[in-house]
Amino acid sequence: MKIIDLSQTLYDHMPVYPGDADVIIEQAQTFAKDGWNMKRIHINLYDGTHVNIPIHGTKNGRNLDSYIIDDFIGKSFLFMSEKDIKKGYGVIFSDKNIDWDLAKIIVKRKPKFIGLSEKFEFDIEIEKFLLEKEIISYERLANTQKLPKEFMFYGVPLNIKEADGSPVRAFAVF
């Protein structure tokens, strides 16, 4: 069994989407003063590796509470061609961004979820189109060039009430 970490490292003042608030990781308590160490983080739900769910880009989409953990885990394929987009399976895009033609194929074939390498960002209109069609998507996946053709993908969100997305610790097992 091999595991590949697909998550970006979160760190203080890391790059964020233009216009978003800065990531801040600060020392809230120290061992010397308080008897333990504790850091506090200030992040947007879309900083680093994260999952997008419909309410993020639609007026009446589903929020995180309406999903179960199984929705974020599944057998997946590394995208090489349109054949790799299959109903009920995940598909990860490492070497190609999603254009309108691919977005329409994705909606038609209904994969369990899709994911984009950190090399790419969704076109906002394409992202909204996919969210309107209830396609779960991951962004800023790291190390996608190390993925085999088939693998189990895990990208489980934090359990945040009524959330519109979440940071994830994503990884592949094969």
Residue locations for each model-derived region?
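Active-/binding-site microenvironments in catalytic and ligand-binding cores
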Residues: 1-174
